[in-house]
Amino acid sequence: MFREAIYHRPKDNYAYACANGELHIRIRTKKDDMKEVTLVYGDTYEFDDNKWTYSTAHMKKTGSDQLFDYWLASVTPRYKRLRYGFIVNDRKDSTCFTEKGFYPEPPVNDISYYFSFPYVNQADIFQAPEWVKDTVWYQIFPERFANGNKDNDPDGTLPWGSREPEIDNFFGGDLEGVIEHIDYLKELGIGGIYFTPIFKAHSNHKYDTIDYMEIDPQFGTKETLKKLIDVCHKNGIKVMLDAVFNHSGVFFPPFQDVVEKGKNSKYQDWFHIREFPLVMEPRPNYDTFGFTSSMPKFKTENPEVKEYLLEVGRYWVREFDIDGWRLDVANEVSHAFWREFRREVKAIKPDLYILGEIWHDSLPWLRGDQFDAVMNYPLSTNIVNLFANQSVSVKEFVENMSHVIHMYPDTVNEAAFNLVGSHDTPRILTQCGEDVERLKQVFVLLLTFIGTPCIYYGDEIGLTGGQDPGCRKCMEWNPDQQNRELLQHVRKLIQLRSENPLLANEGELTFVPPKNEEDPCLAYTKSNEEKTIMIIINKSKNSVEYPLSFDAAEQTVKNLWNQEQLILQNGQTLELKANDFKILEF
């Protein structure tokens, strides 16, 4: 027994409360070390004859990464408090693991040995907006989606799609163009639109904000935005805007005041300026996003800055009824600011979705007091490595994703913003070597996984493009130039997800362990007490026979993709043709 690999902490992703009153308790052990793990638990104050009374619960192995196994038990404490430990059994030995170490038997004379969940306080439970779990998002880069009003085109606007995207060219995309294509999004099955910034700025991407309180004139007016949001809401589509509170653009008036007046500017303490006069090149002598001199970093601990940015957050929720904020470079802004931001905007709209752009382990932001979710780039990376780069095996993918899933509580994973492409990454079809069959498999995984999936505009019709700015092509609206088969594939997957809650966030996800390093089939189940849906993806260019395992000797199975009914025997193999997939319900 490798005791040094056994780990638990009584908080965060290892011990957390759910809205239904359940406590989820996890423990980590060395991979393949334990035969079984049992949870020992009881109320903090219940004793019988001066001995603590406890119950036991079998813990289920919920996944394995390259080094560890993860185990879970769910209990509902009668009095909303719990003391607990673990009995670990490696086939040769059994021992009780507690907060104070290892013991041959569960200690009953002193509960201070045990881990403690002192009380389930409702205010401490992580709860993302319920509607998010059923939402399929669509990311729109407004300058490249559709030109609905040529009167607001900036000078030098190019004919739509006439050239490759460049860092500084414009094609006239605007909010009116989105309004004109709401029917397209509704037919696709989209439930939410994530817009990259629409506030006044000089660039085509608008991340260099000049005025946080104004719509960029090339996109329209505030009235246009109100019309857009109204049309979206009438069609069951949520709207999420993108804000940059880490830094402003260089032409943001307060920063321009500092440029002009130096240390005499009343705004000089709005930014992290190390010395005067300001130096912009080769490296600025003030803090910025990266070393980009045109993006000076806000000092959010300054009360004036904090109030200005908080009012930005409040204003667009209060006056325009937006449904979410996506927060750029969120990890470089203080936790204190985000806690206050959450309180302020949720006071106006409690079910507002707050999404942070963070590329690494994000648990410190996901404790229920800051964000509802972060952009799930670890999932993106693993999907790209499996299907596009083909640099990891199915076994490695399962291990990597098991690690990611167990980094967070299940309640966090359900609201994770899952994506395979964005304005910051090469087009997913390009990364797949323009192999549409591989891209279809990517969409199968994206749209049947836990979390809330997002499609980058045009990926559903096969747009291609390299790294930024190549990934920001104009949307193709000519049906003859769209990959209609791919579009229908994505539509059908979204419809299946909508019709089958298990394909979204109901139930439990479990990976089926690959047979070996060469196994080309990725398989996982989504299950509840009533039924199971199994997704099998053959990423090989050859047909394979996939062995099926059921609890019963014979099982009636429905293929949800083609509605075919099958009667299969336990242990029977199922043929998957090259690049094929199955979505089986039983």
Swiss-Prot record:
State its Enzyme Commission number(s): 3.2.1.133
Entry annotated with the keyword Nucleus = no
Supply the alphabetized keyword list: Calcium, Carbohydrate metabolism, Glycosidase, Hydrolase, Metal-binding
Q: What class of enzyme is it?
A: hydrolase
According to the UniProt entry, its GO molecular function terms are:
glucan 1,4-alpha-maltohydrolase activity; metal ion binding
So what does this thing catalyse? hydrolysis of (1->4)-alpha-D-glucosidic linkages in polysaccharides so as to remove successive alpha-maltose residues from the non-reducing ends of the chains
Q: Kindly indicate whether the keyword Calcium belongs to this entry.
A: yes
| Binding positions (substrate) | H247, R326, H423, D424, D468, R472
Q: Where is the active site?
A: D328 (nucleophile), E357 (proton donor)
Q: Which InterPro entries match?
A: Glyco_hydro_13_cat_dom (IPR006047), Glyco_hydro_13_lg-like_dom (IPR004185), Glyco_hydro_b (IPR013780), Glycoside_hydrolase_SF (IPR017853), Ig-like_fold (IPR013783), Malt_amylase-like_C (IPR032091), O16G_dom_2 (IPR045857)
Q: How is the cofactor bound?
A: Binds 1 Ca(2+) ion per subunit.
Return the annotated site residues (Transition state stabilizer). Answer: D424
Pfam families, per database record: Alpha-amylase, Alpha-amylase_N, Malt_amylase_C
The UniProt entry, under CDD domains, shows: AmyAc_CMD (cd11338), E_set_CDase_PDE_N (cd02857)
User: Which prosthetic group or cofactor does it need?
Assistant: Ca(2+)
Q: Which residues bind Ca(2+)?
A: N147, N152, D153, G172, D174
Any single GO BP term: carbohydrate metabolic process
Q: What does this protein do?
A: Converts starch into maltose.
Assigned protein family: Belongs to the glycosyl hydrolase 13 family.
Q: What is this protein called?
A: Maltogenic alpha-amylase
Organism in which the protein naturally occurs: Bacillus acidopullulyticus
